[in-house]
């Protein structure tokens, strides 16, 4: 209950439901959700249940305006977006239908959906903060919360109906819960692995972007426990968690494949669509893809991008100073431990988690160097995570 109340308070305080006060990003992708909600609002259907638009251009915001104005549309004009499952489109479509019972104005429903999406993101963040509190104390939890509340990119993006940022935290939360239950009981119940499976499946059904990031962050808390506990036992749990997470990804791919069979009418057509969507993200066949090396991608991520990751009024902090401050903090901790003649190994867990937090978004930048290199949104938002 406290988490829910705080999530509501933070959403209202930071005006996250307003595109005018907190901004937005990637409205082009959001049109797919608006198209799907408009379709369901008017009791229309199409094979496969994909998201889509009623215009020729995938990014045409006319779909959003038609949704807001409750404009009648023809089912023959619907273009399905078959490059992902589109679970978020169906979920928001159902929620929109419920809201329409007592709110006929599309613009009002849109604002409500933005607020709900933001509250879910804050709720997930607060649960992570609770885990951080238990591991490292209240100051660390407060720092984590501030890293979200005062981060420009998540503040703009948490309302986005396409990206659904709160689902990005589900695999990490599943990993944290697994660790908490295991440390309390001394063993890992089977349902903890099932939650990891479900978390990764749900996230991937809302989009496979940053898939490597989610898988790494899912394991981060287990790596922390491995560094400070029974390493053989925790290694075994890490392996089982990895299988559960990959199983969730495979299940999402299976759901996508079945949708494709329904839409295209054959397994061959669905397979061609699936493989084409995946390879276009990592090959030069996509118009957005740039022929860049891994070194160029890493240089862009760590050196070239100077978008603010934190903003406190006129004061902004970018990635390079943030890394420098963190390294300085580790150095001071090492010095204090050395002076007190305490084992330096106590910092192994936090250090590994920090390294994984940097490596997680970088892994996707390398795998999908095409979009990550040309699209500043991906780079900056991943850095905030």
Enumerate the language-model features and the residues they cover.
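Aromatic- and kink-enriched transmembrane "portal" helix at the membrane-lumen/periplasm boundary
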Residues: 106-114, 144-170, 200-201, 205
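Transmembrane-helix motifs of polytopic, lipid-linked glycan transferases
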Residues: 112-142
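Membrane-interface alpha helices of multi-pass inner-membrane proteins
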Residues: 191-210, 214, 244-247
């Amino acid at each position: 209950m406290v988490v829910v109340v705080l999530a509501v308070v933070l959403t209202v305080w930071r005006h996250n439901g307003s595109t005018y006060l907190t901004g937005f990003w990637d409205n082009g992708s959001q049109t797919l959700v608006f198209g799907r909600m408009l379709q369901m609002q008017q009791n229309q259907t199409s094979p496969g249940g994909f998201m889509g638009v009623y215009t020729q251009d995938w990014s045409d915001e006319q779909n959003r305006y038609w949704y807001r104005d409750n404009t009648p549309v023809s089912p023959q004009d619907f273009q399905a977006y078959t490059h992902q499952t589109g679970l978020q489109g169906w979920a928001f479509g159902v929620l929109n239908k419920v809201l329409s019972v007592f709110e006929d104005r599309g613009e009002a429903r849109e604002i409500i959906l933005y607020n709900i999406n933001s509250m879910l993101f804050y709720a997930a963040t607060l649960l992570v903060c609770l885990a951080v509190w238990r591991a490292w104390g209240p100051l660390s939890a407060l720092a984590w919360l501030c890293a979200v509340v005062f981060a420009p990119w998540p503040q703009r993006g948490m309302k986005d109906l396409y990206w659904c940022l709160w689902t990005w935290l589900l695999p990490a939360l599943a990993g944290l819960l697994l660790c908490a239950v295991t440390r309390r009981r001394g063993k890992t119940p089977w349902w903890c692995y099932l939650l990891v499976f479900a978390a990764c499946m749900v996230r991937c059904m809302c989009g496979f972007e940053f898939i490597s990031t989610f898988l790494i962050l899912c394991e981060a808390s287990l790596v922390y426990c491995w560094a400070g506990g029974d390493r053989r036992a925790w290694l075994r749990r890490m392996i089982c968690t990895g299988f559960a997470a990959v199983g969730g990804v495979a299940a999402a791919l299976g759901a996508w494949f079945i949708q494709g069979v329904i839409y295209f009418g054959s397994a061959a057509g669905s397979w061609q669509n699936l493989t084409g969507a995946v390879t276009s993200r990592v090959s030069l066949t996509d118009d957005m893809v740039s022929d860049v090396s891994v070194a160029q991608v890493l240089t862009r991520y760590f050196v070239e991008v100077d978008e603010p990751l934190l903003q406190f009024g006129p004061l902004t902090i970018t990635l390079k100073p943030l890394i420098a401050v963190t390294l300085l903090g580790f150095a001071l901790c090492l010095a204090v431990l050395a002076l007190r003649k305490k084992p330096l190994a106590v910092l192994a867990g936090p250090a590994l988690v920090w390294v994984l937090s940097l490596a997680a978004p970088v892994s996707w930048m390398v795998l999908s160097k095409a979009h990550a290199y040309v699209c500043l949104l991906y780079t900056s938002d991943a850095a905030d995570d």
